Amino acid sequence: MKTPEHQAWNPTSWQTRPAQQQPSYRDATALADAVAKLSRLPPIVVSWEVDRLREELAAAQRGERFLLQGGDCAESFDDCESDKIAKRLKILLQMSLVLTHGLKKPIIRVGRMAGQYAKPRSADTETRDGVTLPSYRGDIVNHAEFTPEARAPDPQLLLRGYERAALTINFIRALIDGGFADLHHPEYWDLGFVGHSPFKVEYERIVASVADGLEFFETISSKEVHTALRADFYASHEALVLHYEQAQTRFIARNNRWYNLSTHMPWIGMRTAQLDGAHVEYCRGIANPVGVKVGTAMDAAWLQRLVTTLNPQNTPGKLTLIHRFGAKDIESALPKAIQAVRATGHSVLWICDPMHGNTESSQSGLKTRRFENILRELDLATRIHQDLGSHLGGVHVELTGEDVTECTGGARGLADLDLQRAYKSSVDPRLNYEQSLELALLIAERNRAPRRSR
């Protein structure tokens, strides 16, 4: 009998496996029609961009690059607005400039954008005042309003999700091609928080050094820096709603491979990483680089099987393991995970998600995360990898370019009482603009590479 990873694969073979976290559509014909329409639409990304990202991730595995992956916990259709997209892109690019300066290596920029419209839920239903309805699973599945009509999964939302994703990625490409007027000039960045930090001197030194380096580049190259340093930017989302992913899976004859062209880098979450499950089955057959969230519930045998199933040929850049243990558990859990993967003989890219393992409830009942715990998990991850002869190749964060108050701490010392001032997330708390940039400054300072000898 063939094991799951040795059975024949095609874009629909996931339908023969147990599929967690999938919507229960009432009308199978309407679903089939929506999937058929979606499969005829142009791809959102192209195969050569996917291949280029895989090559860059392979370089990150070798320690030659660093992955910055970030964006909203869950995108909403209403947030498909030029200003909000530009702010998210801008903070990611600003963070990448700071990290490039501090780490002295190129940064791979990957957004949780242009497709992050679905969210896994801990329960299939929600009950309010004695009324039970399907859980809200993200805008690509149903609506947040607590009514039977809004909560019914609607296949047409798959098409609306495609449209929003295409609009988002096209606008991002236009912004990158045109350059931001102030992106490469730190004197125009919003750095008001720096004066509130005990690391004020270090932050100011880093920002001044970035500005000096960019000014020097423009002087010797006779080009504006944003035209010479055009930033590649990639999209990623959790491959959760598999009918959507299936419909955008295309065979590229010149490569003789199947690609998911709804995004550059799909990932599998903890709730859908079952070895015999539909999500692992789907992701094992595509040429895209794939991420997998790794938490405390995943034992060594499970992790090892995932590695060999998702990347049987040990292709460099194919598999990124995103560990999310939390500051309190990382010291006991991460060494076991590193040793388990090493025993397979396979190479992976290790990156840290310091957000999900550090979620807690505030005194007012809002979900929040403490900046100090986020930073502590990153610090511990870096040290543990170094101690075990491995290396941390990136960071995965939930953030926004807006002035929200969802995570406590940071230079301004946001407290529980501050959260209600601008708490906008409908799912998980995000770092705001200032906290995101501060995190990049701290990573750059604590992992500063020595200056190369001339």
Residue ranges and their predicted role:
Residues 1-66:
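N-terminal basic/disordered segments at the start of proteins
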Residues 52-54, 276-279, 306, 335-337:
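Glycine-rich, charged/polar anion/phosphate-binding loops
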Residues 57-60, 98-100, 282-283, 384-387:
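A general structural signal for short secondary-structure junctions and capping/turn motifs
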Residues 68-73, 110-113, 352-355, 398-400:
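Short loop/turn segments at strand-loop or loop-helix junctions that form parts
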Residues 74-75, 79-326, 369, 377, ...:
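Active-site-facing alpha/beta catalytic cores
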Residues 294-295, 354-358:
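Conserved phosphate/anionic-ligand binding catalytic regions in large, soluble enzymes, centered on
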Residues 303-306, 310-312, 318-349, 356-405, ...:
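Non-transmembrane, aqueous-exposed alpha-helical and coiled segments at domain scale
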Residues 401-419:
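Short glycine/proline-rich, acidic loop/turn segments that cap or connect secondary-structure elements
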